[in-house]
């Protein structure tokens, strides 16, 4: 059974620092005619980034399963990372202070595995809110940029041909990337909402006796979380930091409401 102290010793947020700290995926539009060396270098960078992401996901999954006392699901996550790789990754974190109290919700006397369910809920809610907010930020930023180049063209009294050649066409790849990335964050937010709703269904069924929550249900929800972390776009650290305090307060309030509904009084 995970103790209250154990469940509190994690950085406050949806995903571990190793995952959040990775650079954002780059969406490029390579043009024909560029040398093969550049394409090879880009592919190598993508492979390295993918390997680093997978390693971080596996380490976080190992941490979660140890913290939550859940069995490792090799069918979903493959083999667990070896201790040497975990130690090597941990050495890249210079300041560990900001990464304490990850599951910052107050669990009180909620028994295991009900407390695990509440922590999984905080992860789902946190990620759902951040992905939706960042997708909206990208959409607004892209719209503002598109509007700014139109205004610039009007102020400069550009002809349509000049506007297309000098501003619109060069900006199109970046604008399309922004739209695509915003949509992917909104889709990720929707998927996190589905997991969140699933968690609520399990909690509602066992809210009178949280200790009777089936462990296999927690494992199933953990699998869903792992797959979303693996396939979803990352939220930048700076954006996460701007929202951290507010989201922590919101998820604490939500957890307190759920816990109060399970109290016999």
Predicted regions and their residues:
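Membrane-proximal soluble regions of multi-pass membrane proteins
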Residues: 76-81, 115-122, 215-230
């Amino acid at each position: 059974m995970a103790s209250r102290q154990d469940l509190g010793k994690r950085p406050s947020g949806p995903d571990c620092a190793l995952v959040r700290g990775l650079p954002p995926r780059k969406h490029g539009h390579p043009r024909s005619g560029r040398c093969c060396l550049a394409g090879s270098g880009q592919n190598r960078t993508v492979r390295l980034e993918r390997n680093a992401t997978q390693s971080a996901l596996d380490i976080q999954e190992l941490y979660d399963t140890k913290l939550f006392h859940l069995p490792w699901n090799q069918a979903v996550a493959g083999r667990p990372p070896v201790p040497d790789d975990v130690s090597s990754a941990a050495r890249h974190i210079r300041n560990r202070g900001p990464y304490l109290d990850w599951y910052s919700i107050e669990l009180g006397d909620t028994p295991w595995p009900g407390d695990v369910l509440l922590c999984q809920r905080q992860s789902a809610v946190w990620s759902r809110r951040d992905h939706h907010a960042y997708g909206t930020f990208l959409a607004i930023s892209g719209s503002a940029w598109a509007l700014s180049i139109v205004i610039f063209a009007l102020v400069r009294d550009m002809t349509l041909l000049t506007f297309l050649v000098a501003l619109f066409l060069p900006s199109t790849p970046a604008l399309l990337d922004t739209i695509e990335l915003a949509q992917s964050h909104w889709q990720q937010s929707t998927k996190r909402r589905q997991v969140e709703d699933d968690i609520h269904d399990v909690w509602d069924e066992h809210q009178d006796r949280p200790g009777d929550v089936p462990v296999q249900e927690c494992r199933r929800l953990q699998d869903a979380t792992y797959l979303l972390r693996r396939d979803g776009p990352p939220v930048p650290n700076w954006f996460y930091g701007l929202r951290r305090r507010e989201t922590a307060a919101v998820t604490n309030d939500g957890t307190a409401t759920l816990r109060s509904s399970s109290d016999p009084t």
